[in-house]
């Protein structure tokens, strides 16, 4: 799997993401600066990592979404290329029009930084084939604006089309207000576009891929992408 990690001013999770990709795929990802106008030839996966691009001024991800490299990312996605946005990367994908909705301030107006449980809603997508449907995984979050919101029609469409891939839940898989850490509509933690090749999620799977971290639940996302691309080759 040949991956490319986008680097914007203020991003601070690009090295975490690059390490996870390298450990799981066995290949060193390319680091692509925001001012670039093209992606490396042969790229299979583009990742927008977490952090605080441009200091989160205006709106989280709003300035990064207008960076030169994003035209190449939109074209890549339009051609069916796989795109993953994590945390600030999710915000960037929403601001760039690659995903619907927006990420608002957490309901309790506080920064959240701890492990959470997610329920995997489907296992038949490139981003979830490393898991079983209904499986509960544990991954970290670190955000102040992770409260996913969209109009009622968009939420209805996301649910009806099976485009919610990850949902906040309890350790046993229960979904509800008690386990909804940030107030996100329908406890949404991660969604895909209509075509299913662009995923945005607030939690950080890249931080749970090694035994030394005490949990490897995030590894399945990356292993699933590798398996999907190998099968498609």
Swiss-Prot record:
Q: Which NCBIfam families match?
A: FGAM_synth_I (TIGR01737), PRK03619.1 (NF002957)
Question: SUPFAM superfamilies from the xrefs?
Answer: Class I glutamine amidotransferase-like
| Annotated Glutamine amidotransferase type-1 domain residues | 3-233
Primary localization = cytoplasm
Q: Which gene encodes it?
A: purQ
* GO CC list: cytoplasm
Q: What is the lineage of its organism?
A: Bacteria, Pseudomonadati, Pseudomonadota, Alphaproteobacteria, Hyphomicrobiales
Catalytic activity reported: N(2)-formyl-N(1)-(5-phospho-beta-D-ribosyl)glycinamide + L-glutamine + ATP + H2O = 2-formamido-N(1)-(5-O-phospho-beta-D-ribosyl)acetamidine + L-glutamate + ADP + phosphate + H(+); L-glutamine + H2O = L-glutamate + NH4(+)
The name this protein carries in UniProt is: Phosphoribosylformylglycinamidine synthase subunit PurQ
The yes or no answer to whether the keyword ATP-binding is present is yes
Biological process, per Gene Ontology: 'de novo' IMP biosynthetic process
Q: Which GO terms describe its molecular function?
A: ATP binding; glutaminase activity; phosphoribosylformylglycinamidine synthase activity
Assembly behavior: Part of the FGAM synthase complex composed of 1 PurL, 1 PurQ and 2 PurS subunits.
Query: EC number(s) of the enzyme?
Result: 6.3.5.3, 3.5.1.2
């Amino acid at each position: 799997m040949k991956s490319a990690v986008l680097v914007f001013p203020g991003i601070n999770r690009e090295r975490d993401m690059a390490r996870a990709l390298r450990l799981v795929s066995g290949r060193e990802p390319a680091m692509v600066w925001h001012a670039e106008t093209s992606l490396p030839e042969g790229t299979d996966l583009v990742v927008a990592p977490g952090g605080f691009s441009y200091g989160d001024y205006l709106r989280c991800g709003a300035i990064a979404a207008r960076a030169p490299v994003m035209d190449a990312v939109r074209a890549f996605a339009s051609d069916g290329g796989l795109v993953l946005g994590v945390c600030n990367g999710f915000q960037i994908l929403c601001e760039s029009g690659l995903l619907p909705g927006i990420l608002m301030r957490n309901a309790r107006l506080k920064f959240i930084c701890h492990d959470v449980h997610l329920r995997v809603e489907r296992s038949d997508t490139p981003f979830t084939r490393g898991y079983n449907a209904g499986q509960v995984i544990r991954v970290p979050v670190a955000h102040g604006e992770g409260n996913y919101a969209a109009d009622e029609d968009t939420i209805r469409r996301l649910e009806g089309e099976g485009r919610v891939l990850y949902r906040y839940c309890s350790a046993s898989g229960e979904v509800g207000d008690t386990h909804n850490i940030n107030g996100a509509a329908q406890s949404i933690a991660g969604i895909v576009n209509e075509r299913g090749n662009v995923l945005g999620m607030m939690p950080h799977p890249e931080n749970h891929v090694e035994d030394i971290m005490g949990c490897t639940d995030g590894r399945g996302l990356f292993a699933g992408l590798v398996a999907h691309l190998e099968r498609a080759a």
